[in-house]
Amino acid sequence: MSATGQSKRLAVPDIAARKGREPVAVLTAYTVSMARLLDPHVEVLLVGDSLGMVLYGFDSTLPVTLDMMIAHGAAVVRGSSRACVVVDMPWASYQEGREQAFRNAARILAETGCAAVKLEGGEEMAETVDFLVRRGIPVMGHVGLTPQAVNALGGYRARGRSDAEQAKILGDARAVAEAGAFALVVEGVVEPLARAVTEAVPCVTIGIGASAACDGQVLVSDDLLGLYGAFTPKFVRRYAELGPVIEEAAATYAADVRARRFPGTEHVFAARKAS
């Protein structure tokens, strides 16, 4: 604790040091209000490009822009004081080359105040990861089911069911880790492969639809809270069902308005009495 009584914000080295220790809890956040609610309870707040589907109604993450990620990343940093904030690099903001990746990653860090960026890809992105890390930009990698490559992968299906696919993903994980990533999201792979990746790489692994053996876990908060109804992946556990609660509150409010029960006298300002 600091002299002011506030806990210090967790930094990239704090997360990296959790390898093989107490698992790291990660949740997504896109707004100030959600960041404030989640911040005391998790080690990492991930501003994921999943916001494109959850907040904007896109059918994939591909339409998400750099400006969107920066706006939401800055909001989450402002709304938090403890968690390490990581911001996704959106599709086409880093794949062109390492110089493009550096320019956009540097802009994300400078304009949001976040601690690190996350990018998807395996061996083909190792050079870019190395380029960023050597220039002071911490990187969280992402292998396995990579949503930005959904068109090339042929949809959202579990990866690593064949020997060839397992070897490819394991090689991707090693390449990104050796390039200097401090953490690695392992998404949508068969459980034994996620366990093997965790054992093979020196960096923290964060599982999502992977394995309890990973060094941490991440979920999309709207999935966890029952707020995203488009579909529920197999790997999601709903810890609350807030959708019906919100619907009931809205319906009750609307009924009170129509019946003139709201606002009541306690919600309006009385005129001052003349002195």
Curated annotation (Swiss-Prot):
Leading EC class: transferase
GO molecular function annotations of the record: 3-methyl-2-oxobutanoate hydroxymethyltransferase activity; magnesium ion binding
One Pfam family matching this protein: Pantoate_transf
CC cofactor: Mg(2+)
The EC number(s) this enzyme carries: 2.1.2.11
Residues forming the catalytic site: 187
Annotated residues for binding of 3-methyl-2-oxobutanoate: 49-50, 88, 118
Co-factor: note: Binds 1 Mg(2+) ion per subunit.
InterPro entries according to UniProt: Pantoate_hydroxy_MeTrfase, Pyrv/PenolPyrv_kinase-like_dom, Pyrv_kinase-like_dom_sf
Catalytic activity: 3-methyl-2-oxobutanoate + (6R)-5,10-methylene-5,6,7,8-tetrahydrofolate + H2O = 2-dehydropantoate + (6S)-5,6,7,8-tetrahydrofolate
Pathway note: Cofactor biosynthesis; (R)-pantothenate biosynthesis; (R)-pantoate from 3-methyl-2-oxobutanoate: step 1/2
GO biological process, alphabetically ordered: pantothenate biosynthetic process
Compartments where located: Cytoplasm
NCBIfam families (alphabetical): panB (TIGR00222), PRK00311.1 (NF001452)
The protein's role, per its UniProt record: Catalyzes the reversible reaction in which hydroxymethyl group from 5,10-methylenetetrahydrofolate is transferred onto alpha-ketoisovalerate to form ketopantoate.
Name of the protein: 3-methyl-2-oxobutanoate hydroxymethyltransferase
Lineage: Bacteria, Pseudomonadati, Pseudomonadota, Alphaproteobacteria, Rhodospirillales
